[in-house]
Amino acid sequence: AQKWTTQTEIIKSIVLDEWQTITFDFKNDTFLKFNESSPDPVNRTDLNRVLIQINGEDNNAKVTAYIDDFLYDGTISDGNDNNGVDPVFDQLVWSDEFNGTGAIDNGKWFQQTRPIINGFDWANGEIQHYTNRTDNSYVSNGTLKILAKKETYTSYEVYTSGVTKGYTSARLNSKYAFTYGKVEIKAKMPFGVGTFPALWMLGQNITETGGYWAATHGTTGWPDCGEVDIIEHWGNNQDFVQSAMHNRSSFGGTVNKGGRSINNASTEFHIYTLDWNSNKMTFSVDGIVHYVYNPEDKNIQNWPYNAPQYLLFNVAILPNIASNFTQSAMEIDYVRVYQSNTLNTKDILANSFKVYPNPASSEINI
């Protein structure tokens, strides 16, 4: 829809050649919705700016409007309390649309292949090798494929004698890390009980052997670095997806979590979204929120999420994989990271007042 269709308008009459006080009561004033099917303003959370427009009968005539005082009679949050206004992240700062063909973009992604547990295993009892081959991760027809396969494969990542396993897959680390923003991923899950795909994040400071950031930023172990599972998909219910948080206060057993059932998780693309600000993390699928992580008393135990995190995409294989499994892929149409919220409470609290254009002729933006 065009941007103006989301507008809500309150009209006030003004008089000429004298001072007057004009009050806008956004809760009780009569309003006009440009899109009649949209919710009433008091029920919306996506309105993020106020535009004051002064119109004369002839908009081509030059009109000088004087504003002496501008007062907001209410509370503006600094974003550090649970009642604050959520920032709106609307500027694309990093993405991969996966429009090429062949190998992944090495400028954006790192293939993590070295096992993290004793140089042999991965977490959760996974039984696959991760490889950097295009057999397991590649781009085609506008999507990234992370392909888990049943095959005998020997890895020499740690042991010169080699370690042989019966499955292969891929685990990607983003070469981009960020603090706060919106992550949007359009993806389709693989088929099969025993496949364990995940779209998730780890703290850039994790000391994980073989990870992309460990050598340059690794100072903290897991779970103190903080883990954010944007979406995971496993188990007997193949249309169930879940988001979860791991940190010093709760890890391993997955205490902080929330999920929902969706239709056709493995046959249709769905949009998985994380909104991350200094106050909370909100998880949604196709625009429907299913989990919010928002500890009331944030501390180092439960909130290490004020530092950069990076993205990980992988498909693991669990021990309960069906014996007739051969291969299946997680497909990702795009991943996009947005930042630079349009509503900046620091700017509001600075009590700055800006008028465009200056001098004003027909329109004032505040």
Describe the function of each predicted region.
Residues R44-L51:
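Noncatalytic modules at the cell exterior or secretory-pathway interfaces
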Residues D17, Q53-G56, Y72-T342:
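GH16 jelly-roll
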Residues D29, A103, A360:
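Hydrophobic pocket-lining residues within nucleotide cofactor-binding pockets
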Residues K346-I366:
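Surface-exposed, proline-anchored Ser/Thr-rich loop/turn motifs
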Residues I10, Y66, W94, Q309, ...:
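Cysteine-rich, disulfide-stabilized extracellular repeat modules
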Residues K12-S13, T134-V139, V355-P357:
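Short, exposed beta-strand/loop patches in secreted or surface proteins that constitute
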Residues A1-S38, D46, E57-Y66, L71-D73, ...:
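Extracellular ligand-binding interfaces
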